[in-house]
């Protein structure tokens, strides 16, 4: 019994200051996390000149270059001269957005195709193309699996 009593006496008593310090630490941590979640897309939007600076790959149409769940970064496009055949572009369509490779540039439209697809897409008007993927060493810069978070949250 005496041993038990000694243990209880040795328990440190938390001071009000340490609880407050811990609480403030958590508040700062949460504020920084919220700042990153909100601020990163805004900063990327400004840097990349794109309303949509990041995109999650939601299908296998660009396999093996881009896989479902990859996160890619989108550089905004202001004119038809800012991309060429072979670039991967993002364009608006009635279902949302599509990320496919440019196969051909014609006078009024662009012909695209997913790398894993056998057929060409419906021609895309130049004004519907909003950007192209950011490249690093000649390949799309992507973060594997990070896009899965967006895919899950948008279900």
Regions from the PLM with identified roles:
Residues 103, 109-147:
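Extended, hydrophilic extramembrane loops/domains of integral membrane proteins
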Residues 88-92, 112:
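Short beta-strand segments that buttress and anchor functional surface loops
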Residues 57, 88, 98-104:
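Short beta-strand-centered aromatic/proline hotspots
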């Amino acid at each position: 019994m005496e041993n038990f009593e000694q243990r209880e006496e040795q328990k440190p008593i938390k001071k009000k200051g340490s609880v407050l310090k811990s609480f403030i630490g958590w508040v700062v941590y949460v504020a920084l996390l919220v700042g990153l979640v909100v601020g990163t897309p805004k900063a990327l939007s400004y840097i990349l000149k794109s309303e949509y600076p990041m995109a999650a790959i939601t299908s296998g149409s660009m396999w093996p270059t881009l896989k479902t769940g990859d996160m890619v970064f989108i550089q905004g496009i202001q004119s038809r001269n800012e991309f060429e055949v072979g670039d991967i572009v993002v364009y608006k369509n009635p279902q949302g957005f599509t990320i496919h490779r440019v196969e051909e540039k014609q006078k009024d439209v662009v012909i695209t195709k997913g790398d894993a697809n056998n057929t060409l897409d419906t021609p895309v008007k130049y004004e519907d193309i909003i950007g192209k993927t950011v490249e690093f060493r000649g390949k799309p810069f992507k973060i594997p699996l990070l896009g899965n978070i967006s895919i899950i949250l948008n279900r």
